[in-house]
Amino acid sequence: MAQRFYLLLLLLIFLVNLICFSSQQDLSFVFNGFNQDQAGDELLLDGFARIQSPERVLQLTDGTTQQKGHAFFNRPFDFGSASSQSLSFFTQFVCALVPKPGFYGGHGIAFVLSSAHNLKKAYASSYLGLFNRSTNGSPSSHVLAVELDTVQSAETDDMDNNHVGIDENRIQSVVSASASYYSDREGKNISLILLSGDPIQVWVDYEDTLLNVTLAPLRNQKPSKPLLSRTINLTAIFPDRKAFVGFSAATGSSISNQYILGWSFSRSRRLLKSLDISELSTVPLFTEQKRKRSPLLIVLLVILTLVVIGGLGGYYLYRRKKYAEVREPWEKEYGPLRYSYESLYKATKGFNKDGRLGKGGFGEVYKGSLPLVGDIAVKRLSHNAEQGMKQFVAEVVTMGSLQHKNLVPLLGYCRRKGELLLVSKYMEGGSVDQYLFNGDKPPLSWSQRLAILRDIASALCYLHTGASQVVLHRDIKASNVMFDDHGANLSATAAVGTIGYMALELISTGTSTKTDVYAFGAFMLEVTCGRRPFDPEMPVEKRHLVKWVCECWRKHSLVDAIDTRLRDKFTLGEVEMVLKLGLLCTSIIPESRPNMEKVMQYINRDQALPDFSPDTPGIGVSTPMVMGIPGLAITSTSVTSSASVPLVSPPSTNNSMFISHTILNGDGR
């Protein structure tokens, strides 16, 4: 009796296992095309996914951006009690990825095993409708996918824009390869374009923990070698031992229609039914949905169009007035040197006050930046008189042709009604007066100071004798001599600076050069003594620098006039020569001043100074009224003018106007 009971119990256990095994074996199906009656009941669709009739295809996405679609078999694939080694499944499907004509589409399609069929929270685009940023890479995602990806994304570490990959719980593939298939006839892999619109066969086989992915064109037999192979523990990804099988597809900014033409699935290789290629539908052509526009919408579009046209017309008139310029036929010959007002307006950010470099008697200077040119300085000058403008522009252009290693040429000009704009290169270094009078700058060595003087003398000599016509500077002072490169390497190289760069003052031609010689002499004393030409804070006897230096010479103590910050680190003979030359250049008798060619010879020690003393007439006189010479002025800016030539010419019709230039390089002496 007991023996019979045990036999019945064993038989019952066998029948239960047989039923379970049979239920697992039953998960086999084939769709040789999709129709609404059969596939509509057996597939779970979401997103855009739909069965398209009468084409009998499963469409996952349409021709719109940021779209996704999912299609899963309505019953999960139940692993049962099978071990990971004995677990297996086999599937074959035919897909087609059809781009919009003339465009490159995306993003791709994936065969999916997922613990849940609801992936509505997943992202489209490069996530292929499988993950979002929070689920991507999470073990709780429980997703295994074989992706056919047609867009290369840096975010997902894609190898190219035409690859196949295996994804485990993340969109970044654990293994991938460029799409191709093995040709048994040729014995090599042949490239396959996924986004061609042509049908492609895909086989995904999982057996003995090995997942193989194989591709081939529609009419080819299954190749003997897979494209991808990967050992995968399926039960580790799906601990509850169940998974839905199906497809996911997505578009991003690039679009395509993505279709499944047929699908076969089985847990057994032997029971897997091959697709009947002859029964599959052809790939539908790419069509965009046509939407009917209501009359109201048409009216609104017309009104909107008129509003836009009116707005654009108003904006055009506003811009035309805002950027209006004055152009005359005679200016055509200067065309290459003329800048548009709009370009200068934008370069200076609307002449923003934050970019203002300085303000002088004739206008303001702004910093700007032009493409292919770099940083510039733009001087805005008021000029209401049209008479003489042609001569003025001609001379400005002539000034732009000056070339000297210590001069930056004028880049160009622009003019509007009542306004003239002059453009020159911008040099970023600080001015000499900042190094002489500000404590936050390192003091200049004597060799640097001498190099500055030699460079400026060279530039002035060129303006007076080397150009096609005599050019006066008439605003030489420490604040107008600037260092390039923020004064970098001052200890190793000569100072680099500018003449009149910050002020961009106007100059004249064809008149006496002695005004520049006087100004240069005052500048020599300023650089050597480290003092301003006129300092009201000093004692009366030291207030005028020219007079005080002459008095030191008279007392045989020129060394007392030298900048104390030099700390005896100078050549006494050089310093005394510079101080005496400065006094000679500042003689209030113009005929007694040397020309700049002579100054160059003196300062370079090519010729000795002429004999003169502190008591020589015109030497060391700080005010012109002592000599009774009317019209001669010596200002606190260390610049003088002769009676026949005013120091700074007012903007009149009889005055030629030029922009000053920039010293580029010292010679390191």
From Swiss-Prot:
The keyword Membrane is annotated on this UniProt entry: yes
Annotated compartments: Cell membrane
Main location: membrane
Coiled coil: none
Keyword match Ubl conjugation: no
GO cellular component: plasma membrane
Top-level taxon in the UniProt lineage: Eukaryota
Extracellular side: 25-295
Signal peptide (residue range): 1-24
One Pfam match: Lectin_legB
Keyword terms: ATP-binding, Cell membrane, Glycoprotein, Kinase, Lectin, Membrane, Nucleotide-binding, Plant defense, Receptor, Serine/threonine-protein kinase, Signal, Transferase, Transmembrane, Transmembrane helix
Region (Legume-lectin like): 26-266
Protein's GO biological process: defense response to fungus
Recorded family membership: In the C-terminal section; belongs to the protein kinase superfamily. Ser/Thr protein kinase family. In the N-terminal section; belongs to the leguminous lectin family.
Protein name, UniProt field: Probable L-type lectin-domain containing receptor kinase I.2
Organism: Arabidopsis thaliana (Mouse-ear cress)
Name of the gene: LECRK12
